[in-house]
UniProtKB/Swiss-Prot annotation:
Official protein name in the record: Ribosomal RNA large subunit methyltransferase H
UniProt entry keywords in alphabetical sequence: Cytoplasm, Methyltransferase, rRNA processing, S-adenosyl-L-methionine, Transferase
Top-rank EC class of the record's enzyme: transferase
Organism per entry: Rhodopseudomonas palustris (strain BisB5)
Gene3D superfamilies: 3.40.1280.10
UniProt-listed InterPro entries: Alpha/beta_knot_MTases, RlmH-like, tRNA_m1G_MTases_N
An example molecular function term from Gene Ontology annotations: rRNA (pseudouridine-N3-)-methyltransferase activity
Stated role: Specifically methylates the pseudouridine at position 1915 (m3Psi1915) in 23S rRNA.
Residues binding S-adenosyl-L-methionine: L76, G108
This protein's encoding gene: rlmH
Disulfide bridge map: none
Taxon lineage: Bacteria, Pseudomonadati, Pseudomonadota, Alphaproteobacteria, Hyphomicrobiales
Length: 160
């Protein structure tokens, strides 16, 4: 199963990008041993539409173009479900074991995600009630993906 992160906005050079790349690399190394076929990141430019509805619609169209048929869609949204790391790992493991071709994680723009896109998701995740900068959400997601791989591998990184 291939994992993909689709994010509205680009990470500029700096500590957030370095940390994101570190977790991505760690996952790639361990994930291949667990039957995952890598982790892709697609950055989509923020819409320049005048209103929030227009921006969300343009961004949703760009996101939809990257969603492969048969993939499990996971959206990140403040209204989503908060799951612990073990449950997150178990879900990724189930999708892998069910031969789902891919799991696609979507991080929306400043206005959030179009409700229709959120409804299509098999899972809508939240990293709590706080509002997080998009750069941090990407780093936190990549860390959780890496942590999930360590849990599935029985690696001591996760000590819960």
């Amino acid at each position: 199963m291939r994992l993909t992160v689709i994010a509205i906005g680009k990470l500029k050079q700096g500590p957030e990008r370095e940390l994101a790349e570190r977790y991505r690399g760690r996952f790639d190394d361990l994930g291949r041993k667990l039957g995952f076929r890598g982790l892709d990141i697609h950055e989509i430019a923020e819409s320049r539409a005048r209103d929030a509805a227009g921006r969300m619609a343009e961004e949703a169209a760009a996101i939809a173009a990257l969603i492969a048929e048969g993939s499990s869609l996971v959206t990140l949204d403040e209204r989503g479900k908060s799951v612990d790391s073990a449950a997150f790992a178990a879900q990724l493991g189930r999708w892998r074991d069910e031969s789902v071709p891919g799991t696609i994680f979507v991080i929306g723009g400043a206005d959030g995600l179009l409700p229709e896109l959120r409804r299509k998701a098999k899972l809508c995740l939240s990293f709590g009630a706080a509002t997080w900068p998009h750069q941090m959400v990407r780093v936190m997601l990549l860390e959780q993906i890496y942590r999930a791989a360590t849990i599935l591998a029985g690696h001591p990184y996760h000590r819960a």
